[in-house]
């Protein structure tokens, strides 16, 4: 029988990195973490990645960004306590937080056409739990949640549909990276695009997501895998993950789309944008083969940005589409990727270029701006 404690006994005071305002450094300080309510889970976060989406929101350019907030959405840890009605995880489970929940009941989940879930989208977008309140407080003020995860805290509270149990055999400094970047790219190639064998592929942007697409393209036995990046330092990384070619658009005498068309006998079968640059998105579409080429948009553009192309590009058979979390369903499919890693079929270790502690989390944001950083993992255990 589960021992039920009262709210005062369950209230925790722990360390977290708080974003009090846009474009300001995170402040590592004590926060109150309330107990989980019905259908909620409190997690002890052991490791978290730092993603460009966190930096985007912190910059103030995110139209849904609100402050004060605890950022972070790429985390793994151990279930510390559960609220009433939670059946999918239990205390002691090793878990990954999910910014794309999976309820299995809403029209999105039942459609079989998407990994998006609508059950808590409205409240998650406002930075609160499904009941409209928050579980964080500091300096006497409520703190907002971020993407339903808030992994920049020693302890966090998430909805039960926003967490998945995985094998404890996988270290959390690896499994955390499956909470966003690696899964987003790998899934874009293997699930959303479902690349066919022998296809020619171009990947725009060679960060964590782009390199994960390369990894997925290799898995699907693509033909030419062409990585496009303006940073020559990414060339070695591209080849490390299985690319067959590397292009720096700044060094070309023609447009990158024309170069890709020439390299692939009329255009790529699949292209992927991981940059968030709307001009690059257009180039990626126009590099697709007439009649069947697909371009998948993954990068998030700044607020107010719009994509454009000549309608004839679409009339003649090219397809523009997008995906979140690579089209992967978090609760039903993510554990399989953890097993793939443990079996040696999915690279994770190779993405980790930097490590930091919670106290130095702002350094991780600075490192992310450098061309040699693929992923920084933050150790969330405070001694």
Curated annotation (Swiss-Prot):
Reaction(s) catalysed (UniProt annotation): a primary alcohol + NAD(+) = an aldehyde + NADH + H(+); a secondary alcohol + NAD(+) = a ketone + NADH + H(+); S-(hydroxymethyl)glutathione + NADP(+) = S-formylglutathione + NADPH + H(+); S-(hydroxymethyl)glutathione + NAD(+) = S-formylglutathione + NADH + H(+)
Binding-site positions, Zn(2+) 1: 51, 73-74, 180
Cofactors demanded by this protein: Zn(2+)
EC number: 1.1.1.284, 1.1.1.1, 1.1.1.-
Gene3D superfamilies, A to Z: Medium-chain alcohol dehydrogenases, catalytic domain (3.90.180.10), NAD(P)-binding Rossmann-like Domain (3.40.50.720)
GO biological process, one term: formaldehyde catabolic process
InterPro entries to which the protein is assigned, alphabetical: ADH-like_C (IPR013149), ADH-like_N (IPR013154), ADH_3 (IPR014183), ADH_Zn_CS (IPR002328), GroES-like_sf (IPR011032), NAD(P)-bd_dom_sf (IPR036291)
UniProt-listed Pfam families: ADH_N (PF08240), ADH_zinc_N (PF00107)
GO cellular component, one term: cytosol
Chain sites annotated for binding Zn(2+) 2: 103, 106, 109, 117
Domain of life of the source: Eukaryota
GO molecular function: alcohol dehydrogenase (NAD+) activity; S-(hydroxymethyl)glutathione dehydrogenase (NAD+) activity; S-(hydroxymethyl)glutathione dehydrogenase (NADP+) activity; S-nitrosoglutathione reductase (NADH) activity; zinc ion binding
Alphabetically ordered keywords of this record: Metal-binding, NAD, Oxidoreductase, Zinc
UniProt binding sites for NAD(+): 52, 205-210, 229, 298-300
Cofactor notes: Binds 2 Zn(2+) ions per subunit.
Sequence similarity: Belongs to the zinc-containing alcohol dehydrogenase family. Class-III subfamily.
Database matches in NCBIfam families: adh_III_F_hyde
Job description of the protein: Oxidizes long-chain alcohols and, in the presence of glutathione, is able to oxidize formaldehyde. Also acts as a S-nitroso-glutathione reductase by catalyzing the NADH-dependent reduction of S-nitrosoglutathione, thereby regulating protein S-nitrosylation.
The name this protein goes by in its record: S-(hydroxymethyl)glutathione dehydrogenase
């Amino acid at each position: 029988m589960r021992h039920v404690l009262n709210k005062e006994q369950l209230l925790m005071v722990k360390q977290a990195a708080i974003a009090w305002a846009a474009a300001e450094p995170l402040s590592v300080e004590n926060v109150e973490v309330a107990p989980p309510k019905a259908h909620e889970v409190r997690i002890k976060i052991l490791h978290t990645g730092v993603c460009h989406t966190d930096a985007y929101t912190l910059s103030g350019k995110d139209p849904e960004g609100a402050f004060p907030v605890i950022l972070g959405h790429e985390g793994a840890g151990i279930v510390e306590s559960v609220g009433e009605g939670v059946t999918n995880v239990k205390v002691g489970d090793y878990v990954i937080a999910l910014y794309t929940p999976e309820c299995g009941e809403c029209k999105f989940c039942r459609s079989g056409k998407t990994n998006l879930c609508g059950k808590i989208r409205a409240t998650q977008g406002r930075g609160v739990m499904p009941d409209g309140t928050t579980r964080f407080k500091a300096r006497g003020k409520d703190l907002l949640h971020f993407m339903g995860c808030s992994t920049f805290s020693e302890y966090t509270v998430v909805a039960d549909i926003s967490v998945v149990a995985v094998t404890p055999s996988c270290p959390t400094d690896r499994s955390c990276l499956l909470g966003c970047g690696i899964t987003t790219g790998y899934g874009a190639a293997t699930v959303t695009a479902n690349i066919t064998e022998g296809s020619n592929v171009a990947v725009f942007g060679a960060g964590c997501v782009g390199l994960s697409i390369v990894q997925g393209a290799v898995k699907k036995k693509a033909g030419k895998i062409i990585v496009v990046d303006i940073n020559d330092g990414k060339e070695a990384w591209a080849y490390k993950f299985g690319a067959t070619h590397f292009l720096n658009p700044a060094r070309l005498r023609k447009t990158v789309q024309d170069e890709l068309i020439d390299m692939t006998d009329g255009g790529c079968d699949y292209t992927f944008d991981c940059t968030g640059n709307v001009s690059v998105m257009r180039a990626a579409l126009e590099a697709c083969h007439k009649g069947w080429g697909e371009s998948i948009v993954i990068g998030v553009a700044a607020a107010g940005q719009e994509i454009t192309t000549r309608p004839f590009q679409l009339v003649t058979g090219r397809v523009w589409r997008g995906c979140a979390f690579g089209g992967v369903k978090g609760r039903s499919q993510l554990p399989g990727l953890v097993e793939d890693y443990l079996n040696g079929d999915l690279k994770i270790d190779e993405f980790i270029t930097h490590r930091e502690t919670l106290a130095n989390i702002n350094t991780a944001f600075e490192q992310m701006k450098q061309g040699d950083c693929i992923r920084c993992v933050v150790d969330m255990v405070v001694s």
